[in-house]
Amino acid sequence: MHIRNSAKAIIIQGEKVLLTKNQDTDGYFYLFPGGGQEHGETIQQALIRECMEEVGQQVEIGELLHIREYIGKNHEYASADVDVHQVEYYFISKIVNETKGNIEPTNPDSHQVEIEWVPINDLSEYRVYPKTLRKYIIKYLKGVKSPVYLGDIN
């Protein structure tokens, strides 16, 4: 199996972060908008495309905050993700010229049911993946430096 690159957006407005709300057999779970890099596009081009699909908004990409690996065989969904090895690049991003009213995805993933602004202080109450990233976002907002490379975390 090959290693897949993925770009993710950390979009913060005020005290909230924008996440995709998804559903599986265990209920709702939340992910940072973004997805896989396609052949011939840069990681930033992938993020712009994926945000348009999942959030329906143009984003401006800022600082690369974290790089996280996900080696599926090492985590809770190992039986389903045994062949998955993904490198994810998390960028601070912002919505450019946000349209008024509801933000709607243009081409959501099959498990995505909507998008939601989640209070950052309540992130621990949500089933957010990767779980470990929640604490790093809170540290970032407090001005606390964290490593860029986080390793194989979930």
Stretches with model-predicted labels:
Residues 19-20, 104:
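Beta-strand scaffold of nucleotide-dependent catalytic cores
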Residues 26-29, 76:
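A short local loop/turn or secondary-structure capping micro-motif enriched for an aromatic residue
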Residues 38-60, 71-128:
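Unchanged
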